[in-house]
Structures are given as C-alpha cells and as structure tokens.
C-alpha cells in the first residue's frame, strides 16, 4: 500500500529526521522509481546481476541519469537472499572484484555478514547461500578469514571512499573506452569546492 508508506515515512521523518527507509524490493523499475518518489531514501538494486561491462555501463547510466532524482541505489554484492552464479564460481576473486565495483560505482554500498570469508556455497537450486542467517545463527571465524585479504580490502575501500568525495556521488560518473570487453574504465569527479584538497 503506497499511500500508507508515503504517510508513514513523512510522519516519522518529521519527528525523527535522521531515520531513513530502505526499500528492500526487487521489483519492476517503474515500481522502484515509485518507491523513491513516495519517500524511500534508499533502494536495493539489480547490481548483483550486472556482470558484463556493457551491463554495468548501461545500468549505471540509467541510475546516474534517468532515475537519480528519485532512486538512491545501494549496491550489495551479496545478501542473505542473493548469491549469484558469478559469486559462486568466482570465489575470493569475485568477492574482491564486486566489492571494489560496489564501493566505487555507487555512493552507498553494503556488505553482508561473512562477506570477508567469501562464503559461496549455494543452496541447491537457488541463488542464495546454503546456510544463511534467515534460518539459523551462524558463528564465523573472522580471524581465520584474514588470510584471504578481503577484510583489509574492505577497510581500504572505506578509507579511500572517505578520502575521495567523488565516490559519494552518483551523477558524475564517466565511462571510458577500452579495447577489451573484460576491462571497465570509469572516473568520477566533484567540483573543486567539494574536494578535500
């Protein structure tokens, strides 16, 4: 019920302006835009399923130009409900790659618990992890996970994002030509007065 959510978000926003609402809805693009228009400040996206260079470029073009005024995308490489074949087959390398892309392409990104461990065993017949927290508590050995370097990469990405305000922007992204469809090149910029230098 859109009218209900619109009214609720407005009322809560007036009393608690620091509260934001995330639309955890994988639905048709028109509905995702509508959810942004009625007040949801953030939305899950189809980033997890955009793997080819042309798919990423086309999707970022749509998000940064066509829908940026209403849709605030959050890029999640995986969630408790999402473990794409790319992440299953790609193992640690895929987890590193998708973290770098999420952290640098979108102003908002998220990492699911256990991401540092590159958990990539799918539930048979589904695009989700076999033993995720939807159904049970899952203890993890994060100390042992440090060997694969993902934890340090995530730390570095957050530091880099903090140091470079352009990474907090959605609209000023430019894709650059490459001669290899396996390579993607892009840049982001901010006005001089927004720079930390």
Where are these regions (language model features)?
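Active-site and adjacent substrate-binding regions of carbohydrate-active enzymes
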Residues: 1-197
């Amino acid at each position: 019920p859109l009218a209900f959510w619109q009214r609720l978000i407005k009322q809560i926003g007036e009393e608690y302006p620091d509260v934001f609402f995330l639309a955890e809805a994988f639905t048709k693009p028109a509905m995702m835009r509508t959810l942004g228009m009625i007040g949801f400040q953030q939305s899950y996206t189809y980033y997890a399923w955009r793997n080819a260079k042309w798919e990423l470029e086309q999707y970022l073009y749509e998000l940064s130009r066509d829908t940026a005024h209403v849709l605030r995308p959050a890029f999640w490489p995986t969630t408790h409900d999402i473990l794409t074949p790319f992440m299953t087959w790609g193992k640690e390398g895929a987890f590193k790659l998708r973290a770098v892309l999420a952290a640098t392409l979108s102003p908002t990104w998220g990492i699911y618990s256990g991401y540092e461990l590159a958990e990539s065993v799918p539930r048979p017949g589904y695009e989700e992890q076999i033993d995720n927290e939807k159904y049970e508590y899952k203890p993890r050995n994060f100390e042992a996970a440090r060997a694969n370097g993902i934890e340090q990469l995530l730390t570095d990405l957050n530091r880099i994002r903090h140091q470079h305000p352009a990474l907090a922007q959605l609209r000023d992204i430019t894709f650059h030509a490459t001669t290899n469809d396996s390579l993607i090149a892009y840049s982001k910029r901010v006005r001089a007065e927004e720079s930390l230098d």
